[in-house]
Design a protein with these regions (language model features):
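A short glycine-rich, Lys/Arg-flanked "PGG" loop and its adjoining helix->strand segment in the class I
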Residues: 135-150
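Core SAM-dependent methyltransferase catalytic element
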Residues: 194-223
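A short acidic, Gly/Pro-enriched loop at the edge of an enzyme's catalytic core
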Residues: 111-122
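Hydrophobic adenine-recognition pocket in adenosine-nucleotide-binding enzymes
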Residues: 106, 124-130
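Conserved S-adenosyl-L-methionine
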Residues: 179-191
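Class I SAM-dependent methyltransferase SAM/SAH-binding core
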Residues: 25-111
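Conserved class I S-adenosyl-L-methionine
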Residues: 150-177
Length: 223
């Protein structure tokens, strides 16, 4: 449960394509870390001419130890002013992180209707497979997102660590019954610090030694 690896690559690519210019608010399901060290994120931001605030990112010097930088700081750095997180607990972080944190157990219905349809973007970066009541978790995700907003889901397909593991058609079916548009989908494969993405087609697995990788995940952008 963190923002890093291939999803981070995709987000930086989307930034170059001006995707986030239409996003003013984001809610991450889970109190997410950014899994990257200080030198790496500084270089990547400088390469893309993204302003790098050394004070905001100083906790990344701790990586892989904690406390780390929150995902909200990453979104702020991409120009998104409102970047909240939702979880059962709040991790101890740097006091520079002034973003909102909503305490909520995703096993239960979201009752605060002020949060309904509030966010331009809602993310599930390896979080919603951890609540026992996964249906309620995704119902909450739907309720948090504005009509016409975006949802990003990154979930384990092979070798995950949650209570549930998704098939390659799970999110397709969720999208179909809720009339979501699928903007992008792919598998991404992790081995050590390396990640590659491939089309969301299991036929491509014949080119990969699945015994020699860490994990396979699915990635979706829905509207």
């Amino acid at each position: 449960m963190a923002l890093g690896g291939k999803p981070l690559d995709i987000f930086l690519d989307l930034y170059q394509r001006d995707f986030f210019k239409k996003i003013n608010s984001v809610l991450d399901m889970g109190d997410q870390d950014v899994n990257i060290d200080y030198e790496d994120i500084e270089k990547r931001f400088n390469d893309l001419q993204i302003e790098f605030n050394k004070d905001f990112w100083k906790n990344s010097k701790n990586f892989p130890a904690r406390p780390r930088v929150s995902s909200s700081i990453f979104w702020n750095s991409l120009g998104i002013p409102n970047a909240d997180r939702m979880d059962m607990v709040k991790l101890e972080r740097d006091k520079n992180d002034k973003n909102g944190h909503i305490i909520h157990d995703l096993n239960y219905p979201l009752k605060n209707q002020e949060l309904f349809s509030k966010y331009d973007l809602v993310t599930d970066l390896g979080n919603n497979e951890h609540p026992f009541n996964i249906v309620e978790a995704y119902r909450t995700m739907h309720r948090l997102c504005k009509p016409g907003g975006y949802m990003i889901i990154a979930q384990a397909y092979l070798n995950g660590n949650g209570f549930y593991q998704f098939d390659d058609c799970t999110i397709d079916n969720i999208a179909a019954v809720n009339s979501y548009s699928i903007i992008h989908s792919c598998f991404y494969i992790t081995k050590g610090k390396k990640n590659i993405s491939i089309p969301l087609d299991k036929d491509y697995f014949q080119f990969i030694n699945l015994n020699n990788i860490k994990a396979v995940s699915i990635f979706y952008i829905l509207k």
